[in-house]
Regions:
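A general alpha-helix detector
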Residues: 240-244, 292-297, 309-312
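Long, low-complexity segments enriched in small/aliphatic residues
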Residues: 314-351
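Sec/Tat signal peptide C-region and signal peptidase I cleavage site
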Residues: 21-25
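Bacterial N-terminal signal peptides that target proteins for export
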Residues: 1-11
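Solenoid-repeat scaffolds in large eukaryotic assemblies
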Residues: 306-310, 325
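Gly/Pro-rich cap/lid or specificity-loop segments adjacent to the active site
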Residues: 26-291, 342-344, 348-509
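Bacterial N-terminal signal peptides
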Residues: 10-20
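Structural motif
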Residues: 276-296, 301-306, 331-338
Length: 509
């Protein structure tokens, strides 16, 4: 009898382990739910996670998870995990868009969306939504924007989950792996866009045995210092726009010397201007700055479709009509600012280049340096900044015209990942090339391929066939054409009267 006790003890221990595993798998109960933009029911659930990983019994946060079930009855065991951008974007709020982008993949695979901690409904770190007028004021006045961020930081730190040190990418990827385990998936496919590519790379680094395939679009590697590269990459994309306009006959005729026009416009700043609010119809007077002018152009560079309007908008601004350019301020993504700065201030800001001369702290660099000065910084392991070789296929997509994550970042990452990685550039597209139909098909074949060799051999030829949209000239109303002949219109060769600034810019409401 005594000789059999160890076997019984081992059996009891084994059952205990199985019970523990079952308990873990059951820790994410799912229920049917309806989400905006989805054609079918989804499955929603909440996973409890410790705010501080070192204190598993301490403050807990709710991690919100959505599973969009595969349509087929006999689904495949490797779901797709999607990582949103920002940092600070909610993946769940993008459910309809992501379901559309992955519709063919969703036939036989579940799609898993997680509101990363700090985003969406997962311990949200959102600042108060400013009015359109206040947003404009912050864009025109950096100190006002920094003061608003400081106020937001103080308010966020009063929340039960307000220790801003615990929202880094490595901690978020530990959350992701807990979701994978709770769902009972052994290996998963990763799809990441923009900041989601950094998250995907960190998951691959930390949990390589649980990754089957990975596709990342608009690559932002962990060692990329966003505040340092942001303005440089945007300027390169704008220079490409000027070159393409000069090379296209119709654009060159409509907008001769576009690059010089832009430089002259920048040189004229700061400049008092006026704009008409499209909602109220009232004229307001503001001072346009170089920094604000550059920020207005940037959204138009993300998409070549929007970029097709930029030559016209720049020429109109140079003529004193800022309405078209100001319209770009309305395009952007909804992010949780607290999560955004918790990530950037911990992972990027400590590695920023020092300010070393006039203008070196303009634009994004100056904003992040000031905002991060008082922002709590989480610990980031040195291994986070490394990119080990990958044992699984990785597809890296880039837009040749991308103003924030151009191909140079993806090419460097692909080299580090090794022979299992493949970098593909869509030369005539900007940020997020997965939105292009033929690239969605290519991604489907990459993920769906039966073998790694087949995945690496998927035809990506359509990337070279995507054209750049032609420059677009919107029809002008009669009153705008008459204004072009007004002798009192904006002239950057002489100062404007503060009593009667020139007609111009409309606000984004």
């Amino acid at each position: 009898m005594s000789r059999r006790l160890p076997w019984r003890a081992a059996l009891v221990a084994a059952f205990a382990l199985l019970a523990g595993a079952a308990s873990q798998a059951a820790s994410l109960p799912l229920h049917a739910c309806r989400l905006a933009g989805l054609e079918h029911d989804a499955q929603c659930g909440v996973l409890k996670r410790p705010l501080d990983p070192a204190k598993p019994d301490g403050t807990q946060i709710d991690l919100h998870v959505v599973v969009i079930p595969a349509l087929a009855r006999q689904k495949l065991p490797d779901p797709i995990f999607f990582f949103a951008g920002g940092p600070g974007q909610s993946a769940i709020e993008l459910a309809g868009t992501i379901e559309h982008l992955t519709s063919r993949l969703g036939a036989r695979r579940d799609l898993v969306l997680i509101d990363q901690r700090g985003t969406g409904h997962s311990a949200p770190l959102k600042c108060d939504e400013p009015t359109a007028e206040e947003s404009l004021a912050r864009m025109l006045d950096r100190q006002r924007a920094i003061a608003a961020l400081d106020e937001c930081r103080v308010a966020l730190q009063k929340l039960p989950w307000g220790d801003l040190r615990f929202y880094t990418t490595p901690i978020a990827m530990a959350d992701t792996d807990a979701v994978r385990e709770a769902l009972g998936a052994d290996r998963i496919n990763l799809l990441g866009i923009s900041y989601g590519t950094r998250a995907s790379l960190e998951y691959l680094r930390a949990y390589p045995t649980h990754v089957r395939r990975m596709m990342i679009d608009g690559v932002a590697p962990p060692d990329m210092v966003l505040p340092d590269t942001d303005d440089v990459d945007a300027d390169s994309a704008l220079a490409a726009l000027f070159r393409d306009c000069a090379a296209e006959k119709a654009c060159a005729q409509a907008h001769p010397a576009l690059a010089q026009t832009w430089q002259g416009l920048l040189a004229a700043m700061p400049q008092p201007i006026a704009f008409v609010g499209p909602v109220t119809g009232e004229t307001r007077h503001v001072t346009m700055t170089r920094e604000a002018l550059r920020s207005l152009v940037r959204p138009g560079l993300y998409s070549p479709t929007l970029g097709a309007l930029l030559p016209y908008a720049i020429d109109q601004a140079a003529a004193g009509h800022f309405e078209p350019l100001m319209a770009f301020a309305a395009s952007g993504i909804d992010i949780a600012e607290g999560e955004h700065f918790s990530v950037i201030c911990a992972e990027d800001a400590p590695r920023m280049a020092p300010a070393n001369g006039p203008g070196s702290d303009e634009g994004a660099r100056g904003l992040y340096r000031a905002a991060c000065a008082n922002w709590p910084r989480g610990d980031v392991p040195s291994a986070f900044y490394t990119i080990p070789r990958s044992a699984v296929p990785v597809l890296l997509l880039s837009g040749g015209l991308d103003p924030v994550t151009p191909p140079r970042h993806a090419e460097r990452v692909a080299k580090a990942l090794g022979p299992m990685a493949r970098s593909v550039v869509v030369a005539n597209n900007g940020h997020n090339v997965t939105a292009i139909a033929c690239m969605r098909d290519a991604v489907f074949h990459f993920i769906n391929a039966a073998s790694d060799a087949e995945a690496q051999a998927v035809d990506m030829g359509c990337a070279a066939r995507v054209p750049r949209p032609l420059a677009f000239e919107p029809p002008l109303p009669a009153r705008a054409r008459a204004a072009d002949n007004d002798p009192n219109r904006f002239d950057d060769s002489a100062p404007n009267s503060p009593d009667a600034p020139p007609p111009g810019m409309k606000d984004a409401r």
